[in-house]
From Swiss-Prot:
This is DNA polymerase III subunit delta'. Pfam families: DNA_pol3_delta2, DNApol3-delta_C. The gene is holB. Component of the DNA clamp loading complex consisting of tau(3):delta(1):delta'(1). The DNA polymerase III holoenzyme complex contains at least 10 different subunits organized into 3 functionally essential subassemblies: the Pol III core, the beta sliding clamp processivity factor and the clamp-loading complex. The Pol III core (subunits alpha, epsilon and theta) contains the polymerase and the 3'-5' exonuclease proofreading activities. The polymerase is tethered to the template via the dimeric beta sliding clamp processivity factor. DNA polymerase III is a complex, multichain enzyme responsible for most of the replicative synthesis in bacteria.
Amino acid sequence: MAISWKEMNELQPRVMKLLYNSIEKDRLSHAYLFEGKKGTGKLDAALLLAKSFFCLEGGAEPCESCRNCKRIESGNHPDLHLVQPDGLSIKKAQIQALQEEFSKTGLESHKKLYIISHADQMTANAANSLLKFLEEPNKDTMAVLITEQPQRLLDTIISRCQTLPFQPLQPKAIEDRLIEQDVSPHMARLLANMTNNVAEAVELSRNDEFAESRAKVIKLYEVLHQRKGHAFFFIQDQWMPFFKEKTHQEMGLDMLLLIYRDVLSIQIGNEDKLIYQDLFQSIKQHALQSTQQSVTNQILAVLEAKKRLHSNVNVQGLMEHLVLMLQEG
């Protein structure tokens, strides 16, 4: 089931309050621009707005049970149109087809709504066609444009829309959403600190490889600080065969970075912010036996390794150098 109005309100309170008040006062704009980073709920909010727009109950929040709400939920409402890139771009023909469709009377009512996802990917011709469409708004037609890169849109298109900025999601909000979906608390907290995209976090939580990656990272940390002589063997025999791709290596380094951040959090008295709460005892011991400067150096070493990972380097050599830096502190 799609996200509810209440859930969306918790993720993007400013946006949802503005939409709620506009619906209540019957002052909805004819065109909105939802802009923000990937995973901030722009499409979910657009579909919730569509439900409110078409809902037979007529409230500010959709009832979720009438025929129109259910048809939008299943993606088959005849007067709601979703335009997405065809390949790498949204083409002029797609906008022209939309205009032709909207020149007809609504099949279910006098209302029509269209959503253009990744609006920044419109070709120049498509954007110009849309501009003409926006210049002659119909009072019963609403447009919602969605983008992660508003700077790529024509200024004339932006000026004809009410822009609603979607803020990056706070880790706590993502963590709560994941726990609601039966993700374990320790995994939810880690995921919430690795991505601000709820959908991506949910997908990763269901990926066995992510859990295995976490276990490998914890093992490396333990070897680094409890069995120092085995660290190079671990890199060769377990780390490298498992983290084969650079993107996977980067994820492993991100996880490792968060462990050292936890150590620093304990040192400065922020124990409530720990991500690896199940490692509390070993992390606390590390914190007590180290200076803040040495832990800061370890954090900087991981960040430098991440940076060098994207250049043409031997990854095993990079990891072995990182081991030396982490053990030196």
